Curated annotation (Swiss-Prot):
UniProt superkingdom: Eukaryota
A biological process from GO: dolichyl monophosphate biosynthetic process
Entry GO terms, CC: endoplasmic reticulum; endoplasmic reticulum membrane
Encoding gene, per UniProt annotation: SEC59
An annotated Gene Ontology molecular function: dolichol kinase activity
Protein name: Dolichol kinase
Catalysis performed (reactions): a di-trans,poly-cis-dolichol + CTP = a di-trans,poly-cis-dolichyl phosphate + CDP + H(+)
Enzyme Commission number(s): 2.7.1.108
Role summary: Catalyzes CTP-mediated phosphorylation of dolichol, the terminal step in de novo dolichyl monophosphate (Dol-P) biosynthesis. Dol-P is a lipid carrier essential for the synthesis of N-linked and O-linked oligosaccharides and for GPI anchors.
Lumenal side: 69-88, 140-151, 204-223, 275-294, 348-349, 416-417, 471-472
The keyword Cytoplasm is assigned to this record: no
Side Cytoplasmic, residues: 1-47, 110-118, 173-181, 245-253, 316-326, 371-394, 439-449, 494-519
Family: Belongs to the polyprenol kinase family.
């Protein structure tokens, strides 16, 4: 693994004065200072703070990586699909390529061309998640990581694609090369589309590449084995298809929004019915109704969900003006936790199927809002803007609620793990509320507080202990109390020092740590 830690300082007196006089949050100041050249011997505390927060993150990430290497013994163990030796040699080569390309850009354009420190997560998260949960796709996912160095300059894109093709040639047999070349094409297109839609504001370069790799795996790389994954893959493929068709209808045939709404309403269920492949070939909607009716537990879960949402949504909307933005947003975290945890213990497969259907539904809601499709587009825009944060306001997309849904769903769908729910529903929520209200000691280099981090660790650990004690589904029976405490502590400290979106970082890292501990 390679940690990218740029030197922290300033370039000119003018830049330093401008930075110190601004009202930018500390993490934004760090991003500017870390791209400059000269070290501030005069004692600019923010420069040291940036280095400190990046150092803490690097220690945690490298520590978990080398622990993984030590446990897997890559030079001796061979899986049924691919050798761990090949996987780690490949990631080492990718790291060297990334360092080489970054150094070349620095040589040509100076410190301003260096990527953000958070670029390290574009390497760490896809590699570790793929290695621990889908080993057979680790090599291709590691190759796809190189796309994070792509830019709008065609020369850079061409160099990255050529390097990816070379890696495919050396890592795969002739029969597998075409499939993996198609993976590169799909990932590159998805990344460019996300960057274009998000304008590198709602979704920055790191977000776009992480989500493009995730979508590439869902749509193409990973095999759709379980029912919930087949449902997720089918609906997202249907959503992608109808959005593409609507784009052509709007740009080429100049369809009005009302006609696009009709096209979307008709096309999405038709394509979903086509792309969802169940084992018995049954109609997906009829299968779902039958699946729910054949179990009283599922009917009770569905009734409980409906009742809680009917009561909570109007209440939060009514009380929104009397609550702070942060508190009103975190209430949704608590509600989702209460909705899913008890239900998951009663019927985990039903919950995973429900989440697999909910993700495309929320993506559809954002598409309707983004395109302002009648009759719901304006109403959705009005309500979602009430809970939008600064990042949502900075770009065309309202992405925070989608981040939350992806964060809680991914560990459950991939590993039957409630870590995303615990980390976001309880730990992150209380860390934010307590940190903003009572926090006094700030982590160096961020706006987050030590008090908030302690709240994250303590509350997450307590919830884990409660689930360990009363968990009928045996979710945590494979973990000891000390292991749970270690997991919560590492996650809390990393969250406190990182400026990457919590809804991405916390669930993924906690899921990785949970798996590492049990290797």
């Amino acid at each position: 693994m390679v940690a990218i830690i740029p030197h922290a300082s300033f370039t000119t007196i003018k830049l330093t004065q401008k930075t110190e006089g601004s009202q930018m949050p500390t993490e934004e100041i760090c991003k500017i200072n870390m791209r400059t050249r000269k070290f501030d011997v005069g004692g600019n505390s923010r420069d040291f703070e940036c280095f400190y927060s990046n150092f803490v993150q690097t220690v945690i990430l490298l520590g978990t990586f080398f622990y993984c290497v030590e446990r897997l013994q890559p030079w001796s163990i061979v899986t049924a699909d691919i050798s761990y030796k090949q996987i780690f040699v490949n990631v080492f080569v990718v790291c060297l390529i990334m360092v080489g390309l970054i150094f070349t850009k620095y040589w040509q354009h100076g410190y301003k061309s260096l990527p953000k420190f958070d670029t390290i997560y574009s390497l760490y998260l896809p590699f570790m998640v793929s290695l621990l949960f889908d080993t057979s796709s680790t090599v291709i996912n590691t190759i796809l990581i190189l796309s994070v160095l792509n830019s709008y300059r065609w020369r850079t894109q061409l160099v990255v694609i050529i390097l990816q093709l070379c890696l495919i040639f050396f890592n795969f047999e002739a029969g597998d090369r075409l499939k993996n070349i198609i993976s590169i094409v799909i990932n590159s297109l998805l990344s460019l589309i996300l960057k274009y839609i998000g304008q590198l504001k709602s979704l920055d370069n790191i977000d776009s590449n992480l989500f493009s790799i995730l979508l590439t795996n869902i749509l193409y790389v990973s095999e759709a084995g379980t029912v919930h994954f087949r449902i997720l893959k089918g609906i997202i493929l249907a959503l992608t298809t109808i959005i593409s068709i609507n784009y052509v209808l709007k740009k080429v045939m100049h369809f009005k929004p009302f006609m696009l709404s009709i096209s979307f309403a008709i096309g999405l269920p038709l394509f979903a019915n086509t792309f969802i492949h169940l084992e018995d070939g049954e109609n997906p909607l009829l299968w779902l109704v039958k699946y729910i009716l054949e179990s009283t537990i599922r009917q009770k879960i569905l009734f409980a969900w409906s009742s809680i949402l009917i009561l909570s949504i109007p209440s939060i909307l009514i009380e929104k003006d009397s609550l702070s933005l942060n508190t009103s947003r975190k209430l949704w975290h608590f509600i989702i936790f209460l909705l899913i945890i008890p239900s998951f213990q009663m019927d985990s497969n039903f919950v995973k199927i429900a989440l697999s259907g909910t993700i495309p539904v929320f993506l559809s809601i954002e598409y309707i809002r983004f395109q302002n499709l009648p009759p719901l587009g304006s109403a959705i825009e009005l309500q979602l803007r009430r809970f939008a944060d600064d990042r949502d306001h900075s770009g065309p997309l309202i992405i925070s609620y989608l981040y939350l849904l992806f964060g809680i769903s991914t560990p459950l769908l991939m590993n039957n793990s409630p870590m995303g729910l615990i980390g976001l529903g309880i730990g992150d929520s209380l860390a934010s509320i307590i940190g903003k209200r009572y926090g006094r000691i700030r982590w160096k280099g961020t706006q987050k507080t030590l008090e908030g981090t302690l709240a994250f660790i303590v509350t997450s650990f307590i919830v884990c202990l409660v689930l360990l004690r009363f968990d009928k589904a045996a979710i945590f029976n494979h973990l000891t109390t000390l292991q749970l405490l270690t997991l919560c502590t590492l996650s809390g400290v990393l969250e406190g020092n990182s400026v990457l979106n919590d809804n991405i970082l916390i669930p993924a890292f906690m899921m990785i740590c949970e798996k590492l501990i049990t290797l």
